[in-house]
From Swiss-Prot:
Keyword Signal assigned: no
Protein name: Thymidylate kinase
Lineage summary: Bacteria, Pseudomonadati, Pseudomonadota, Gammaproteobacteria, Pseudomonadales
Enzyme kind, highest EC tier: transferase
Alphabetized GO MF terms: ATP binding; dTMP kinase activity
Catalytic activity: dTMP + ATP = dTDP + ADP
SUPFAM superfamilies: P-loop containing nucleoside triphosphate hydrolases
Biological processes per GO annotation: dTDP biosynthetic process; dTTP biosynthetic process; dUDP biosynthetic process
Keywords linked to the UniProt accession: ATP-binding, Kinase, Nucleotide biosynthesis, Nucleotide-binding, Transferase
Residues reported to bind ATP: 10-17
Family from the record: Belongs to the thymidylate kinase family.
Enzyme Commission number: 2.7.4.9
Role of this protein: Phosphorylation of dTMP to form dTDP in both de novo and salvage pathways of dTTP synthesis.
Length: 210
């Protein structure tokens, strides 16, 4: 039995983690085996890389270094967590995956999408998410929510232009491959967002049984 790989994407303050947990609870209530994970991170080694990527520092990190660290963490995450869970037939719900790399390192940092695609193929082979939920909201709302959480990480400290590019890249990717992506209006109340997820649940269950 092959599992199902679902990723949750979106900019800062979009509520991905909260809604990932909600979706997991709904799937588990239907008897589905669910594994929750996140990127960067998901394993002890990858979590240490996450700390390098997110911690504010006086030493500037080059965009290429950032990109390579992201894919190094992803390689470990795939080998240790994601591929084994899919092989067991589980549903993997991952907070961010390679779409975030295209959005943040491609859109935000301005790195070539061809360079990202080459690393994607090297690290992932043919593995791609079965479904990606993009939690979209205006940049100013997302940044306001992120600021309300407290101390900002290295990415959250970026300026408005960076996050405009991140959001645009997510939306471009969703438009280019509508069969894989579902857009969720994350500017709504949490109750309304979760009502939207409830409408997607039958489709997720069908894919899982598929």
């Amino acid at each position: 039995m092959t599992g199902l790989f679902i990723t949750l994407e979106g900019p800062e303050g979009a509520g991905k983690s909260t809604n990932r947990d909600y979706l997991a609870a709904q799937l588990r209530a239907q008897g589905v085996q669910v594994l929750l994970t996140r990127e960067p991170g998901g394993t002890p080694l990858a979590e240490r890389v996450r700390e390098l990527l997110l911690a504010p520092s006086d030493e500037a990190m080059s965009a290429d270094t950032e990109l390579l660290l992201v894919f190094a963490a992803r390689a470990q995450h795939l080998a240790e967590v994601i591929r084994p869970a899919l092989a067991r037939g589980e549903v993997v719900l991952c907070d961010r995956f390679t779409d975030a790399t295209y959005a943040y390192q491609g859109g935000g940092r301005g790195l070539s999408h061809q360079r990202i695609a080459a690393l994607e193929q090297f690290v992932q082979g043919d593995l791609r998410p079965d479904l990606t939920l993009v939690f979209d909201l205006p940049v100013e709302i997302g940044l306001s929510r992120a600021a309300a959480r407290g101390r900002l990480d290295r990415f959250e400290q970026e300026g408005r232009a960076f996050f405009d590019a991140v959001r645009s890249t997510y939306l471009e990717r969703a438009r280019a491959e509508p069969a894989r992506y579902r857009l969720v209006d994350a500017a709504q109340t949490l109750a309304d967002v979760q009502a939207c997820l409830d409408t997607l649940l039958p489709q997720l269950l069908e894919l899982q049984r598929g």
